[in-house]
Amino acid sequence: MPASDRTSETGDVEKVTAAETPKEVPASNAAESTALTGLPLYTVLVGLGLALFLGAMDMAMLGTAVPSITSTFHTTADIGWYGAAYPLTMSSIQLLAGKIYAQFPQKLVFLVFFGLFMLGSLLCGVAVNSPMFIVGRATAGAGAAGVLSGTLAIVSAVVPLDKQSLILGLMMSLVGTAVVLGPVISGLLTDHSTWRWCFYLNLPCGGVTLLALILFFRPPKRPTRTTPLSIPELIKKLDLAGCLGFIPAVVMLLLALQWGGDGSKEHAWNSATIIGLFCGAGVSLILFLIWEHYQGDDAMLPLKFFRDLTIIASCLYGFALLGGYVVVGYFLPEWFQIIKGANPQSSAVMLLPNVITNFISKAVIGVIVNKTGYFNPWLFFGAAVLAIGSGLETNFHPSTPRPNWIGYQILQGAALGIIQAPTLGVQVALAKQKHLIPVALSLVIFFQYFGSSIMLSISLTIFQNLLRPGLVSKAGMTEAQVQQYVAAGNSEVRELTAQIDPSRLGVVLEVYNDAIAGVMWLSTAAALFGFLVSFGFPWKSLKAQTEENKKEAAEEEEEVKVAAVEA
């Protein structure tokens, strides 16, 4: 069937421009030809799983290590950059990573991105000063930008579509686990060794990933081109000009959210710096969208994606669910350590209900989706149980009994059982335009991680806005004492209170408890938004789509054979 004649239910996203037809000749391999089995498959999946875990853990782990890092470098002036550098580069380069995967061999691109991540980790580990550490974090973030989208692309190549729900579910469970355990692992390494091992740890684990991919992954054949791309054509295909609008927009928005706030932050919300960053982000985004419209099918972010309901729903659902879960993953360990007085080891044990349920729900839901072919009911389930679990945690108090917080965690852990659904939805929507899948997956991943960064920044602002007035009005602290609490960090709350006035410990813990409980409303709201977005996913069987893919692949092979005989 000629590429220019193809259409589908999803509308404009499924159309292939005739201009591309003479330059590219589809490869004749069937969709299943790159599938792996046995030891090679398991080895590749283990390597990819390690890469996902390390990349997600690096995003979540820094908070508990910051006090030790600032002590080593003898400065607190760059604390904001410690946390901002990684998500800034990861989010801003995410869409470009998708374009690179679409233009170059998957294996090579993944190895380069993951190599960048490991290089950044090494720079952080050996950093001798604050600027070197920040450069390392930015480098690692740039590498991480291509890790998750590359993982999803590789899984789609080595695992049939109807089996991907189970595999992607288990993979994404590692992301959720890393978000929860990242601060705990960081605390353990910092307490028992040095904060540098938070980054050195990535090197031997990352070596396993590199070996697995180099030895066992056979990348799918790429379409052959009748004429090679020139440098100007490649620049146009990668839409590097679009990057000049997109990257500043993301950087300025995240910096505004990182720096903006009252009291504990570098700039007030109404300061010229923060207002300027928000305005600059808005202008850059508008210019970027105008350019993307002009670029058409070569755009880094094809605007026709936003005419497809499945892709829109996938982006928004990933934004809401992972963003809401990251808030829980960040503040739940804080609640255990501040309110319950747990050390990092005990906190890790107390988080096990969340982690274990996370894995079990992924496996169970993955098997059910694999059998039935439909993931839609579980979209509602995931959003609903996260909303219920987080909503119940808004009632936290210092004496909340063990059975209660275990039950809340079980609900929240079960929520991530369907976090892989947005990526499955994209693959179904673009089943007849596989060359666009890496770009669309990068868009979904961007929304997931950008949502996580946005939600975490907002949650920290909510926490500070509830904490500071509470310490003054309820605990009777002076502004100078409040600043001491903010500077000391959450791990030193009990020790600092013992120095200031031990008799106020109970009231101080209540203030911290109320601030953390208040933050859980953000997670609840995000989950409820995700529940509403679930209505936007069309009901389409993954099994039926897999059979359709096989049939089309067989027809393509037959056409190629006939053409070869006639030639």
From Swiss-Prot:
Keywords: Cell membrane, Glycoprotein, Membrane, Transmembrane, Transmembrane helix, Transport. Pfam families: MFS_1. Residues 1-24, 547-567 are annotated as: Disordered. Signal peptide: none annotated. GO terms for cellular component: plasma membrane. Induction: Expression is positively regulated by the oxaleimides biosynthesis cluster-specific transcription factor poxB. GO terms for molecular function: transmembrane transporter activity. It is found in: Cell membrane. The chain crosses the membrane at residues 35-55, 77-97, 108-128, 141-161, 165-185, 197-217, 240-260, 271-291, 311-331, 349-369, 372-392, 410-430, 436-456, 515-535. Residues 1-23 have a biased composition (Basic and acidic residues). Its main location: membrane. It is a multi-pass membrane protein. Glycans are attached at N370. MFS-type transporter; part of the gene cluster that mediates the biosynthesis of oxaleimides, cytotoxic compounds containing an unusual disubstituted succinimide moiety. Belongs to the major facilitator superfamily. TCR/Tet family. This is MFS-type transporter poxA. It comes from Penicillium oxalicum (strain 114-2 / CGMCC 5302). The gene is poxA.
